[in-house]
């Protein structure tokens, strides 16, 4: 049974209001909202047959007055288009209807730009001068999607520029958008882009994604892009300057997806707490993308928080049937047998640097097709990861993230409408309501407040 700890300086349960009568069911007359709240509860209960009814009812009651925050949801480039409307219960993992059904208070909607090398003419292809322009275009499209949501649905959603905004929006029955950014690649060498994006509302910035960039080494260097592990030895001089600038702007530094050396550099240089917005413990799946115990301790020592991610391949090792198929695939492409899982989950062998684009495309397509055959991880796997992280760093330094729309999703937590299943599993494990409130939002909001207090000056809207 997880331990407890003193309450946060601000009780995140006491500071919220009941949301079942609020206008989170988009486009519906308010007279129907209360009835649809009951429908939503019945729908959710039907999706959670594995939990005893008292646990289900307790989880439901908690989410009527507890703040909840998912720290990593990617904004799809087609969100808001026909068939993917934000105000309809569509095929994606995030929309405002699902958020209302799940009683999710808010989320970090993540703007990132990285040319998808598997798409476009003659794909896949190696970087060209147009890659940076395309990545910046993707950033702009995602930002316009977010601001368009607020423009089109002002009574249902708003942008949280501060923790106080987040609480206020929740009290008004609105979904709170926290704008985050992932991957410094599109910013080139222009440090002033951080000021621009902070002024536009960005409140968390992650240096790294797949592949190294000019600011930091990635935990997943991509040989197809001629990357090598630890090419910069952590942060570049530009990356080091960025740490100070982000601290000055009051923007949270996100260390997920960084190399170990880069994370160590950030922990050494940052005067504010840091966050891993979507990571899992390496002790459960031994890959560089996950956090080692030492890395988790560095985040704790900064005063920060580890937002455990609901990404199945980071939570449980691959089973033998899939591993056998991967070994056969590697033999077909004259690659050495797997030693560990790092190159099982991505095309990371150094020899790929000299492959023709067509050969890489065939291998990558086959690799990811095989990985799709792996049975989904479950909520039990996910809360195992939370348990482990809490044991290592304490309840005050752990939070929750999904990575929806970019690979996240579990058996029992397939979209934002099912977040109460996470709470039900936590209750089953013996977590107290106060500790669940910390995991769902309290810890992250505390860190956000501390980061903004250390700003000089605080970024302005």
Where in the sequence are the language-model features?
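Alpha-helix-loop-beta-strand connector modules within alpha/beta enzyme cores
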Residues: 231-246, 266-274
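Histidine-centered divalent metal-coordination motifs
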Residues: 72-74, 257, 278
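Extended hydrophobic secondary-structure segments
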Residues: 77, 246-266, 396-408
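Short, Lys/Arg-enriched N-terminal segments with co-localized hydrophobic residues
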Residues: 1-14
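Acidic, glycine-rich loop-and-beta core segments that form the ion-binding/anion-interacting portion
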Residues: 260-303
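Substrate-binding cleft of carbohydrate-active enzyme catalytic domains
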Residues: 240-255, 261-262, 295-301, 384, ...
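Active-site-adjacent beta->alpha loops and helix N-cap segments on the catalytic face
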Residues: 213-221, 235, 260-269
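N-terminal hydrophobic targeting/anchoring segments and the immediately downstream early-domain regions
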Residues: 16-229, 285-461
């Amino acid at each position: 049974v997880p331990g407890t700890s003193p309450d946060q300086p601000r009780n995140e349960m006491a500071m919220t209001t009941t949301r079942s009568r609020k206008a989170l069911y988009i486009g519906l007359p308010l007279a129907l909202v209360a009835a649809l709240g009951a429908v939503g509860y019945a729908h959710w209960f039907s999706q959670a047959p594995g939990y005893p009814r008292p646990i289900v009812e307790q989880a439901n009651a908690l989410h009527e007055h507890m703040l909840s925050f998912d720290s990593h949801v990617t904004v799809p480039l087609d969100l808001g288009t026909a068939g993917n409307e934000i105000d309809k219960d569509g095929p994606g993992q995030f929309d405002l209807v699902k958020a209302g059904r799940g009683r999710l208070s808010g989320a970090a909607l993540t703007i990132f730009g990285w040319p998808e090398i598997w798409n476009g003419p003659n794909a896949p292809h190696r970087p060209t001068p147009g890659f940076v322009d395309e990545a910046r275009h993707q950033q702009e499209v995602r930002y316009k999607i977010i601001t368009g949501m607020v423009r089109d649905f002002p009574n249902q959603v708003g942008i949280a520029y501060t923790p106080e905004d987040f609480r206020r929006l929740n009290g008004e029955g609105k979904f709170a958008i926290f704008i985050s950014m992932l991957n410094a690649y599109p910013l080139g060498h222009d440090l002033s882009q951080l000021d621009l994006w902070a002024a536009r509302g960005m409140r968390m910035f992650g240096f790294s994604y797949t592949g190294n960039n000019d600011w930091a080494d990635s935990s997943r260097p991509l040989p197809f892009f001629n990357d090598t592990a630890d090419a910069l030895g952590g942060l570049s001089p530009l990356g080091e300057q960025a740490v100070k600038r982000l601290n000055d702007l009051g923007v949270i530094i996100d260390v997920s997806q960084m190399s170990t050396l880069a994370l160590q550099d950030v922990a050494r240089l940052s005067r504010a707490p840091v966050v891993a917005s979507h990571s899992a413990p390496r002790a459960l799946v031994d890959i560089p993308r996950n956090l080692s115990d030492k890395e988790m301790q560095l985040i704790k020592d900064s005063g920060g928080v580890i937002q455990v991610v609901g990404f199945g391949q980071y939570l449980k090792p691959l089973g033998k049937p899939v591993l056998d198929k991967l070994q056969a695939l590697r033999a077909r492409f004259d690659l050495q047998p797997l030693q560990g899982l790092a190159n099982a989950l991505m095309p990371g062998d150094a020899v790929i640097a000299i492959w023709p684009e067509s050969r890489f495309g065939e291998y990558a397509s086959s690799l990811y097709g095989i990985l799709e055959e792996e049975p989904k991880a479950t909520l039990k796997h996910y809360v195992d990861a939370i348990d482990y992280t809490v044991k290592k760093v304490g309840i005050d330094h752990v939070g929750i993230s999904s990575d929806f729309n970019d690979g996240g999703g579990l058996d029992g937590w397939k979209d934002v409408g099912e977040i109460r299943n996470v709470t039900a599993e936590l209750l089953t494990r013996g977590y107290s309501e106060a500790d669940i409130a910390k995991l769902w939002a309290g810890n992250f909001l505390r860190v956000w407040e501390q980061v903004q207090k250390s700003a000089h000056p605080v970024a302005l809207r």
